[in-house]
UniProtKB/Swiss-Prot annotation:
It comes from Clostridium kluyveri (strain ATCC 8527 / DSM 555 / NBRC 12016 / NCIMB 10680 / K1). Its EC number is 4.3.2.1. This is Argininosuccinate lyase. It catalyses: 2-(N(omega)-L-arginino)succinate = fumarate + L-arginine. One of its GO terms (biological process) is L-arginine biosynthetic process. GO terms for cellular component: cytosol. It comes from the Bacteria. Belongs to the lyase 1 family. Argininosuccinate lyase subfamily. InterPro entries: Arg_succ_lyase_C, Argininosuccinate_lyase, Fumarase/histidase_N, Fumarate_lyase_CS, Fumarate_lyase_fam, Fumarate_lyase_N, L-Aspartase-like.
């Protein structure tokens, strides 16, 4: 049975039926589809378009379908065109002809737009919750490891920072990610139900009632816009892409830091794998997979942008392709957020190695230049002097703090004994606004 067909002389071919069906993926929307239908029926009864008896029968049937799906008694599968057909045809089989009144003053165009907005809002809030949990994990990791380490530019040791300050940079990145998702939810928080196919309906329905019952702040203002655009999905996937970019950058650093070349951290066995041939290997596969899966979300974004870029108003079947892009990107970003939280919550920082890396990198060179500036030298001249000292130290395989005062005075007479205290690594992060590094 189909929800259409009166104007056709021939049946749809099996090839086309399979090609056209979206049930294999839009079945994820069953809860939203039934919820939307129930509110629609309540509104029809409120507006005297359905009788009280008719609405009660339809609501009871919809509740039984939802209950059976939730309890595993009814599988969402079969030769149905989509989730809407599945629900409506099952409803007809259960309660008879009255079920055919369910779709009064509604099109599948506004129905699917509603389902998708409800689903996107619900799942986006789940992403927000996982971001907040990851932020808590990051903050806790930083508080436990407020130790000095090298800060980098160009992947070259640059200045002293703390592990806490470094990892908290990601906390603030994820804070903005969270705010972007919440903003996207706010923008999509309008109900398309009642837009029908593209031009509303001649029935005097109550769109404000359905919007309020479904948790939206208001109905959409324009019928065509309500059923024609998926910009809210594109915005969400764009936000997910930025989250994945941040997760990927963090993953890359974890991969580097866990290598023997850095040896700053230990990733727990729970989030590592081994080699089938090399017994000694412990591979950071969790971080590598997050880095790799970033491309999947980027792909979903570009795919949906490409799908939407050339289609005229209103609904076109191309838009069926929006579901899998959101589903795939949602599944990916949620799993990656959870894996990152697990990985960071079990991470161990090697304080000895982070400190040794600081000593070997001339990371107090900028502070040494500042010392000379404080003694009256222009910064550009101080920069040149310290550069010459670094060159000298490299040749001698020594650190700035390890060369004698007599040696320093060969480069500038401004050096005094207090220079060693000034360029001490711990002291450098307790001076000026560097105190904020903690």
């Amino acid at each position: 049975m189909k929800l259409w067909g009166g104007r056709f002389k021939k049946s749809e071919s099996k090839l086309m039926e399979d090609f056209n069906s979206s049930l294999s993926f839009d079945r994820q929307l069953y809860k939203e589809d039934i919820e939307g239908s129930m509110v629609h029926v309540k509104m029809l009864a409120k507006c005297n378009i359905l009788s009280s008896e008719e609405s009660k029968a339809i609501l009871s049937g919809l509740e039984s379908i939802l209950k059976d799906i939730e309890e595993g008694k009814l599988e969402v599968e079969g030769d149905y065109e989509d989730i809407h057909s599945f629900v409506e045809i099952n409803l007809i089989e259960r309660i008879g002809q009255v079920a055919k009144k369910l779709h009064t003053a509604r099109s599948r165009n506004d129905q699917v737009a509603l389902d998708f907005r409800l689903y996107a809002k619900r799942k986006a809030l789940e992403v927000v919750e996982n971001i907040e949990y990851l932020q808590d994990v990051i903050e806790n990791l930083g508080d436990k490891n407020n130790v000095i380490m090298p800060g980098y530019t160009h992947l070259q040791r640059a200045q002293v920072v703390t592990f806490k300050h470094h990892i908290m940079a990601y906390y603030h990145m994820f804070k903005r990610d969270r705010e972007r998702i919440l903003n996207a939810i706010c923008i999509m928080d309008e109900s398309p139900l009642g837009c029908c196919a593209l031009a509303g309906t001649t029935y005097n329905i109550d769109r404000n009632f359905t919007a309020q019952e479904l948790g939206f702040k208001k109905p959409v203002d324009n019928f065509l816009d309500g059923v024609s655009d998926r910009d809210y999905v594109i915005e969400l996937i764009s936000d997910f892409s930025i989250i994945m970019m941040h997760l990927s950058r963090l993953s890359e650093e974890l991969i580097l830091w866990s290598s023997k070349e850095f040896d700053f951290i230990r990733i727990d066995d729970e989030f590592s794998t081994g080699s089938s041939i090399m017994p000694q290997k412990k591979n950071p596969d969790a971080a590598e997979l997050i880095r790799g899966k970033t491309g999947r979300v980027y792909g979903s974004l570009v795919s949906l942008l490409t799908t939407m870029k050339g289609i005229p108003l209103a609904y076109n079947k191309d838009m069926q392709e929006d579901k899998e892009q959101l589903f795939n990107s949602l599944d990916t970003v949620l799993s990656c957020l959870k894996i990152m939280s697990g990985m960071l919550s079990t991470l161990k920082v090697n304080e000895k190695n982070t400190f040794n890396a600081v000593k070997k990198g001339f990371l107090n060179a900028t502070e040494a230049a500042d010392y000379l500036v404080n003694k009256g030298m222009a910064f550009r001249d101080a920069h040149k002097v310290i550069g010459e000292i670094v060159l000298y130290c490299e040749d001698k395989n020594r650190a700035i703090e390890d060369i004698s005062l007599d040696e320093l005075k060969k480069f500038s007479s401004l050096f005094e004994e207090d220079v060693y205290d000034f360029i001490d690594y711990e002291n450098t992060i307790n001076r000026g606004i560097k105190r904020n590094l903690k």
